[in-house]
Amino acid sequence: SGISGTVFFWYAAVCMALPVIRSRNARNYIAIAALFVFGLTHAVFHLYLQPFQAGALLNGLLAGLVMVAGFIGLVGMRIMPFFTSKRLNIAQVASPMWVALSALVLPMLMAVLMMFQTALPLAGLLGIAAGLINLVQVFRWWHKDVVREPMLWVLFAGYFFTALGLLVTG
């Protein structure tokens, strides 16, 4: 399952890359890289299974979870302000490009450092930074009427706890 799972992620990266590159959709280039790194975390996790290095295995597992948090950050940065503005009929809160990229890039770098067990203090700082940036975004997007809309408050709760998870992991 280790090889097939890794191949799946890398094949998904290739399948996504073809139309994204063809259409020159630069905004989604980072998602292609993230799928590749997701496959890499999957492969390294399975490499640690064979000699059963428990500490390394845990780092590999956490690196994969950090990548999931990065994907949640990427998707959340795109949909939460949009859904909030449309559902509540308010102006959409814009996010600077560096903030939107940080939601995925910081966890992605953190995951790479964790899975190779190198520069772990830097990985921790990246997690703290990603968590704080995402928490700031939750408060920037917040509107008091979110609590009356189940679809919105579930999104906000999920994003909030994902940010806390990155903060605590860091």
Segments the model singles out, each with a brief description of its role:
Residues 1-170:
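Hydrophobic alpha-helical transmembrane segments of multi-pass integral membrane proteins
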